[in-house]
Curated annotation (Swiss-Prot):
It holds the Pfam family V-set. One of its GO terms (biological process) is adaptive immune response. This is Ig heavy chain V-A2 region P-MU-3. The lineage of its organism: Eukaryota, Metazoa, Chordata, Craniata, Vertebrata. Residues 1-19 form the signal peptide. Residues 20-127 form the Ig-like domain. It comes from the Eukaryota. The keyword Signal applies.
Length: 136
């Protein structure tokens, strides 16, 4: 009986984990000065309760924070002049828009959400990432 309850609990926990997911839309190949639009779709929790972070990782480099949307919208200093982050809580999506792309924007872009309020960045559920290449 005890073993059966343990299995039931394990299945319930795993099912709960599987129900929460975050995924970025497809990236692709862009030309310099193009505009990038990426959408982060979350399921299993509501964006009215949790914020979303965007980060990116250029080839051979570390993670670079782009911005966050939750109770407010915050952007890295380098991104402020050409980036916007908007949220659609009805569709549970967050959109990152970045204009005037250059080769330096070539990176894998990630969004993360679903974390607890106290530590949203580190405890977030992150998407698999999407590769964006900027080249003429």
């Amino acid at each position: 009986m005890e073993t059966g309850l343990r299995w039931l609990l394990l299945v319930a926990v795993l099912k709960g984990v599987q129900c929460q997911s975050v995924k970025e839309s497809e990236g692709g190949l862009f030309k310099p000065m193009d505009t990038l639009t990426l959408t982060c779709t979350v399921s299993g929790f509501s964006l009215s309760s949790y914020g979303v972070n965007w980060v990116r990782q250029a080839p051979g480099k570390g993670l670079e924070w782009i911005g966050y949307i939750g109770t407010g919208t915050y952007l890295a200093n380098w991104a402020k002049s050409r980036s916007t982050i908007t949220s659609n809580t009805n569709e549970n999506t967050v959109t990152l828009k970045m204009t005037s792309l250059t080769g330096a924007d070539t990176a894998t872009y990630f969004c993360g959400s679903g974390a607890n309020i106290e530590n949203e960045f580190f405890n977030a559920i992150w998407g698999p990432g999407t590769l964006v290449t900027v080249s003429s």
